[in-house]
Amino acid sequence: MKITLSKRIDLLAFLLPCALALSTTVHAETNKLVIESGDSAQSRQHAAMEKEQWNDTGNLRQKVNKRTEKEWDKADAAFDNRDKCEQSANINAYWEPNTLRCLDRRTGRVITP
């Protein structure tokens, strides 16, 4: 079956408007804008849940902060004690880095510089 050029053009002329009509219905645009105040029941519930979780973890955060501060104070005190031990007039005093104490070379006992 031979299709002539004019039949092809006629077929194209028929199919082109059909294709355009289908493509415009498929690609319909919406120009609707929804504005929410952000004060919905769901957002209030979500905020309440976040606040409850924050309060529940507050005790844990406080413990972590206290532990960190305590460790920092311990390191700071050890640094000060090391300086005092090294500057001590006692020639038998030496700083033990593993135990973070000032010891007497002869007896191995803790001394206060």
From Swiss-Prot:
Top-level division of the source organism's lineage: Bacteria
Transferase in keyword set: no
Keyword presence, Signal: yes
Coiled-coil annotated spans: none
Listed Pfam families: DUF1283
Segment forming the signal sequence: 1-28
Keywords for this protein: Signal
Family designation: Belongs to the UPF0482 family.
Protein name: UPF0482 protein YnfB
Organism: Escherichia coli O157:H7
Gene name linked to the record: ynfB
